[in-house]
Amino acid sequence: MTEEPEFSLGVEEEYLLVDAETGDLREAPDALMEACKAELADQVGPEFLRCQIEIGTPVAADVAQARDHLARLRGSIARHAAEFGLAPISVACHPVADWRAQGRTDKDRYNQISQEMGGVARRMLICGMHVHVGISDKDMRIDLMNQFSWFLPHLLALSASSPFWLGEDTLLASYRTTVFAGYPRTGLPPRLGSWAEFDRSVEMLTETGIIQDASKIWWDLRPSARFPTLETRVCDACPRLDDAITLVALVQATLRMLWRLSRQNLRWRQYDNFLLGENRWRATRYGSTEGLIDFGSRRILPFDEIAESWLAAIAEDADALDSQPAVAGLRDMIARGSAAERQRALFASAITAGATPQEAFRSIVGWLIDEFRRDL
């Protein structure tokens, strides 16, 4: 396990389509999807609901290339959507939309999920971001997965963008996390001893007909079913491109740091999912505003302190990966506050200025439209 992995990157994002004037959800017209497909081929496609669009970047050698891919994809979809009076937004939950009013995409995989999951699937009006990091050695993938779980609550806290649901403040920073928890085989991954153990577990479920393949395992972090990658799935969709890229860079540099430790026969601190799950809940509830538990010191640390410790741990790796500027964006994200905090602040400001709740929510969607286009 000493040969350095590729640490190549791939990013998947899910977007919502809204009316550019009213901010209401709209289904993607067939002509829009055809135009996107004509330009972007298999890098774009429908998602579970017809108001969603999913993108997947080509493999990127580094963070700069991943940013170029994402900027191109976001820009292309925004341009084509505008021709239909629509706009894409990248956010984990629309603040007011009703999942019961959304049409499902007629696709074999989605039809199967709908049949298997019933009402749970119909509520999936949520969007996330998935980050793939290339690690060809299978046992290394499992070893790094075990250690990287520590950082999953950190990523969720930073990405949290879903405070509202059906026009109500949920008091959570990431309501999406609670919606997705309705699916089986979600949450923190179990600690596994080897690739063979993972393979045996998947085989048990496929042989009994529970799942068709490993793509039906929806942990926050998993070995990809399609690629030689570790796939981080915990993040809410990020409204702003550069925030998404900061998270991509943090995932990549942190995995390299863990690999570097393994070369020295060292490991990152390990705690069971009972304790890690408490930090995951804190991230779901508060985002980055109330800190996370440091189990070694038995204290709740504020997120700016967590960030500086994290950046120090991965500094050598960010240098090696040439991702220092993107990683340093962590400080900017904390200073600005999460997308969940900013949506609440916009709502409160609009209400104070005399807006109705409907108008205040519309201002949030307008901000999300602007954020999507920023930094392209």
Swiss-Prot record:
Its EC number is 6.3.2.2. It is an enzyme of class 6 (ligase). One of its GO terms (molecular function) is glutamate-cysteine ligase activity. Disulfide bonds: none annotated. It catalyses: L-cysteine + L-glutamate + ATP = gamma-L-glutamyl-L-cysteine + ADP + phosphate + H(+). Keywords: ATP-binding, Ligase, Nucleotide-binding. One of its GO terms (biological process) is modified amino acid biosynthetic process. ATP-dependent carboxylate-amine ligase which exhibits weak glutamate--cysteine ligase activity. Belongs to the glutamate--cysteine ligase type 2 family. YbdK subfamily. HAMAP family: Glu_cys_ligase_2 (MF_01609). This is Putative glutamate--cysteine ligase 2.
